[in-house]
């Protein structure tokens, strides 16, 4: 799955640091926010019916604004337009490859 005409895209996420009072350790945690699927991702991820909240390039800075209004946050978390995305099947052996293998995302033959 990819965003057309954007070699890299961003997903909305949250990050927090908190103190574990038992150990005194500062725990750094994050989560990728999901939203309802669009028609493309619903077809692919058809068991949980969710997709990551993808941000357009023009919305990336807005997402990072700590004073962003709730209505604007809700707008940013809507499903990404399916016409701006595409997908293809990759080879089944991708699980056996290392993450830095340049062929890991090659289209299935």
Give names to the regions the model predicted.
Residues 1-109:
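A structured binding-face within diverse protein domains that lines the active/interaction site
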């Amino acid at each position: 799955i990819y965003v057309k005409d954007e070699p890299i895209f961003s997903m909305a996420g949250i990050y927090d640091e908190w103190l574990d009072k038992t150990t005194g350790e500062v725990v750094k945690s994050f989560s990728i926010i999901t939203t309802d699927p669009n028609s493309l991702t619903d077809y692919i991820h058809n068991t949980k019916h969710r997709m990551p909240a993808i941000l357009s390039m023009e919305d990336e800075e807005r997402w990072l604004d700590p004073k962003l209004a709730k209505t604007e946050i809700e707008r940013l978390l809507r499903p990404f337009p399916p016409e701006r995305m595409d997908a293809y099947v990759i080879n089944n052996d991708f699980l056996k490859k290392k993450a830095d293998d340049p062929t890991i995302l090659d289209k299935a033959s």
